[in-house]
Amino acid sequence: MGLLAGYQFVKDLESAGALALFVPPEGGFEGRYQRRLRSKGYTTLPMSAPGLGDLAAYLTQEHGIRPAHTGKEDIRVYFQPPLVTYHLENLPPNAKGLVLWLIDGKRLSKQEFAYLAQLTQTLPKFKVVVEVGGDRVVRWEPLADWVAAA
């Protein structure tokens, strides 16, 4: 069976750059929209929003990670490459772009939402979908409009 929904979702994401997504709490519906994005040539990167820390550092700058220790090991710092710029540099040649799909995004602050919306304007091949709440049906709106209204 072909995908029955999602054409308007892809068009709205391409025009807005970042979308606030409302999905039913039982889940499962957002998978068809992710499949629609992949069929249109986008690479999706699903992540959980809680625990990301400083979005600017995590997404676009090299950042240090300190692993947990029990007091018996040396305190170490591992350096990770920037998530978004690393994936954008390594996209397949025929890919339209990278879509960062943030699950449980309602825990992010207004400043973080505004930063994500601004980042999509800076990086043209980068798009963001943030699951910000629940609803009876899947619906979405531009993230910048949702932040302004909140």
UniProtKB/Swiss-Prot annotation:
UniProt GO cellular component terms: plasma membrane-derived thylakoid membrane
GO molecular function list: oxidoreductase activity, acting on NAD(P)H, quinone or similar compound as acceptor; quinone binding
Domain of life: Bacteria
Pfam families assigned: NdhN
Keywords: Membrane, NAD, NADP, Plastoquinone, Quinone, Thylakoid, Translocase, Transport
Localization annotation: Cellular thylakoid membrane
Membrane topology: Peripheral membrane protein
Family assignment from sequence similarity: Belongs to the complex I NdhN subunit family.
Function: NDH-1 shuttles electrons from an unknown electron donor, via FMN and iron-sulfur (Fe-S) centers, to quinones in the respiratory and/or the photosynthetic chain. The immediate electron acceptor for the enzyme in this species is believed to be plastoquinone. Couples the redox reaction to proton translocation, and thus conserves the redox energy in a proton gradient. Cyanobacterial NDH-1 also plays a role in inorganic carbon-concentration.
Assembly: NDH-1 can be composed of about 15 different subunits; different subcomplexes with different compositions have been identified which probably have different functions.
Protein name (record): NAD(P)H-quinone oxidoreductase subunit N
Taxonomic lineage of the native organism: Bacteria, Bacillati, Cyanobacteriota, Cyanophyceae, Acaryochloridales
Gene this protein is translated from: ndhN
